[in-house]
Amino acid sequence: VGVGLSLAYFLYKSMRPAMASLSLSTDKELHDALVFGLKTCRYIDVVRFDGPLFFANSSYLEEQIASHRKNQPELRHILLVSNGINDIDASGQETLSLLIDRVRSAGIDLSLSGVNDTVMAVLEHTHLVAKIGRDHIFPNSYTALRSIHEKTHKNHEAENCPLKHVVFQTSETEKTMHGESGPDSDEGV
């Protein structure tokens, strides 16, 4: 019975891995916006997926991205922080390919950051790198944001962006803490 319950719990957790929208926090690092009470950028959704992308959870990624798109009507770019994706199978590849088609056909761009060597080898072997575009795959989220942010924001839109300045969510008002121009580090998230 214990082994069966453990297996069931493992399968459930594998089907719904941790996934979070990230935003800049007071330590100049990207953290889970919900947990840290941070506002997210309305134009760029920085999404971290923590787990292998395989048959048991690929539809979950697709559902979550669809939900993010629905809840962010001004969304222009999705950055999938991939440090936590340690493996990908054929279902995961197919989901990623379809996801790229869907978001780009809706006028939203998609990039990856922090892709590990194992996953990158699979993406290259299956020609997904060509579909994504090498210029849309970054070594870490900070390098990605430096490239994406300027292209995605127009003029005044960048002034109080939660990816450049710490912006807390509050029930009454938004409290903004202007730091420097965002993350200084090239460390991964």
Please report, for each region that a protein language model flagged, where it lies by residue.
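Cytosolic C-terminal regulatory domains/tails of membrane transporters and channels
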Residues: 15-189
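Flexible hinge motifs at transmembrane-helix junctions and intramembrane kinks/re-entrant loops
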Residues: 1-22
